[in-house]
Amino acid sequence: MVTARELTQTLRARSAERRAKAEVRAERLRAQLPTAARILIARYQASRVVLFGSLANGTHDEHSDVDLAVEGLPSAVYFHALADLMALFGGPVDLVRVEEAMPSLLERIHEEGQAL
C-alpha cells in the first residue's frame, strides 16, 4: 500500500517534471520568436508583431499556445501566415490581427505585450 508520504513525493516529482518540460518547451518557442516576426514582416507585410499571453507573462505550461498580435497583416493572407507560424512553432498559434481585436484584448496586449 502506498503511504501518504510516498504519494506526496510522487506528485511533487511529477509536478516538477511537468514544470521542467514546460520550461524547455517555452525556451524553444522563445528562440523562434525573432524568426516568426521576420516572417510576418518580410513575407506578409506586417508592420508590428507583439508577443502576449502565457509565454509573455511566464504562466505557460506544456499545453500553451503562442499568442501573437500583429498590425498591418492583410486579411487575405491571414491563414497562410498562421500556417507558416504553426509549422515554425510546431503547434498551436493564436494570431490576432490588431485591427479586428476586441478592446479588452487590445488592452491586455498593451499591458503585457512584448514587441518583437
What are the roles of these predicted feature ranges?
Residues M1-S47, N57-E62, G72-L116:
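Catalytic core of pol beta-like nucleotidyltransferases
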Residues L51-S54:
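Glycine-rich beta-strand-to-loop/alpha-helix junction loops that act as flexible
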